[in-house]
Amino acid sequence: MGTLVNGTIPAMKCPKNVAMMKTTSNGVFDGESPLDFAFPLVILQICLVVAVTRSLAFLLRPMRQPRVVAEIIGGILLGPSALGRITSYKNSIFPARSLTVLDTLANLGLLLFLFLVGLEIDLTSLRRTGKKAISIAAAGMLLPFGMGIVTSFAFPEASSSGDNSKVLPFIIFMGVALSITAFGVLARILAELKLLTTDLGRISMNAAAINDVAAWVLLALAVSLSGDRNSPLVPLWVLLSGIAFVIACFLIVPRIFKFISRRCPEGEPIGEMYVCVALCAVLLAGFATDAIGIHAIFGAFVMGVLFPKGHFSDAIVEKIEDLVMGLLLPLYFVMSGLKTDITTIQGVKSWGRLALVIVTACFGKIVGTVSVALLCKVRLRESVVLGVLMNTKGLVELIVLNIGKDRKVLSDQTFAIMVLMAIFTTFITTPIVLALYKPSETTQTHSSVSYKNRKHRRKIENDEEGEKMQQLKVLVCLQSSKDIDPMMKIMEATRGSNETKERFCVYVMHLTQLSERPSSIRMVQKVRSNGLPFWNKKRENSSAVTVAFEASSKLSSVSVRSVTAISPLSTIHEDICSSADSKCTAFVILPFHKQWRSLEKEFETVRSEYQGINKRVLENSPCSVGILVDRGLGDNNSPVASSNFSLSVNVLFFGGCDDREALVYGLRMAEHPGVNLTVVVISGPESARFDRLEAQETSLCSLDEQFLAAIKKRANAARFEERTVNSTEEVVEIIRQFYECDILLVGKSSKGPMVSRLPVMKIECPELGPVGNLIVSNEISTSVSVLVVQQYTGKGPSVVGSVSVPVVETP
């Protein structure tokens, strides 16, 4: 097997007298091993690579490391530095004769990935980049590049004893490797830490984008100078041809794909033919640059940068990103790992070179960035964090190093040293940034403080005129399209009468997990400049779920504004609470983490992580919170249209602040002409009320009585039922008696002598409280939907201030 000119050079070469592997086997029953044939072997290799890299990513997740760190380490572990030292493993799993197929797939994945990276870079935004980002990018590039050139003379490749034709390419490769910033990895770190849309994040991304483009230009120069050339004019022809290719693409590509984009209306599926044309154009661009002598990935990157951004590019990303990121790209890390032999780093000089490279990379990047950032009047702490962020390495670093090694510019030892440097600099980025710059402190100066410490300027008015002037704002959170119908019916009921609907506003938030997919980062970059989700007034770039919710709201008279919150599920509650705080909402409604299966009459847990989200929102919310347990509310035949809308609502009132808030919310619904409200007041016997209650509970009971008395005088739309119970069995019977409705409203922490004595059972959902758990359990066979309400006890907007009921202070 010969050496590839522009492809990759396997670390373990196949002897020329060894025959190429056949594609498929006849099976083990014919005495043939699948490991001796190319196709079954590459399947095993892909599965092994994915299993190892994903396992490492899971282990590194608590340290909030980007997945690229796990993939680089996984490639090294599968290579000669670890498992590759086992001869039987190397000869059976990664034999030299199989590497051509694996290398081809890896480079195909790399080519498509660089196309996706190019799509993340918006030339329009770069044209608007301020002098601050340009200055920081220049300083963060030039100083480490210069220090990299000086450092390169500590390596034998730059000495006089080396190949003189390789000295200049080696110096450039070293300079690029030390000065490059991994744009994609940086974006994911910033998004993970919720810094992507802050001032610091925007400066970092703009500077990294400029850095990335400059690095690719320098890399193209280094590649054109490297290689075995028969004539000294060949590098010049390669360079000129590369420039001509870029100019031709700049003139042709945008026009062609803008024409195609106009033929694909937004909101409609993109035709298969257009997607094939786009992908073939990417492959042909890679073929062209490979034929020129640069590298195939350079053509794909140029196509991505010049590709018009919009719904057409979004559709292409959606179609290919999972295959590329999940299966093909990890193969490139393995091919890199098969070339990385850490055992070649031996002796004091070798380890000294490693330390020198790490110090040079960190010092040059951080000092260069900090010095210029301070001149641009960026605060010292933010300047240091900016320098650390700009020092992020990743896949682009590996690409530079692998091209250098494939073209015999870098030796095995130098290659291993540079790979370890890339891992170290990327690994330390997240912990240093977290130590210096807390995500909770990243709001703009004009935004003041975080939602946890802010006190609302709005006050709850006790006078009737003040209540009429106050607008009720509700934040609705959606997990999937199944939440649309039940939430829309709740919102239609909550809008109240025709007189109050003008003072009712709904904010709908689609909860989306932040992933390693490029589309996630591109969506995060569309949020507002202060780090909070952008509330979409023009309905642009909305998710399918929010668009469907808005379409459903048109049948009603509800005013809806939408947003898509993209965060790690562990911190997405911060987006919910921050948005509720910034919009001064009085109520947040969350979907239950289980979905109701109507045929089986049972719950199914789809995403258990959402239970933790609901708990954290209950703990940190700046307003009242409701959890909607949907058991067919969206399945009935009642339309959402205002003219013929009907909903039967029952409120179970035991006592306490949460029950009072649930009752007030029910009264708001009762203002709607299509809502029938029944309030069931459940109390214990007089002996239990006076003999068993302590002083504080007696005070709460008195507050409940005052509250109910005042409401009965002013609430004409509700029917009140009073029930006195002597045992918990009677409580269960009353609940069964009144569950013949569309939805039950209960408080999360209901008070009263009977609540504490409800049947003891395994509490699977503490966020629902004792009454909510009882209703959704098998103890009561019912399919009624439930809204569990928790009142906000701090200072801020409340549902109480939005309806004509008295405000009762909670002790």
From Swiss-Prot:
Its main location: membrane. GO terms for cellular component: endoplasmic reticulum; membrane. Gene3D superfamilies: 1.20.1530.20. InterPro entries: Cation/H_exchanger_TM, CPA2_transporter, Na+/solute_symporter_sf. Keywords: Antiport, Ion transport, Membrane, Potassium, Potassium transport, Transmembrane, Transmembrane helix, Transport. It is a multi-pass membrane protein. The chain crosses the membrane at residues 33-53, 68-88, 99-119, 136-156, 167-187, 207-227, 233-253, 266-286, 287-307, 315-335, 354-374, 384-404, 415-435. The keyword Transmembrane applies. Expressed in leaves and roots. The keyword Ion transport applies. GO terms for biological process: potassium ion transport; proton transmembrane transport; regulation of pH. GO terms for molecular function: antiporter activity. Signal peptide: none annotated. It is found in: Membrane. May operate as a cation/H(+) antiporter. Belongs to the monovalent cation:proton antiporter 2 (CPA2) transporter (TC 2.A.37) family. CHX (TC 2.A.37.4) subfamily. PANTHER family: CATION/H + ANTIPORTER, CATION_H(+) ANTIPORTER 16. This is Cation/H(+) antiporter 16. The gene is CHX16.
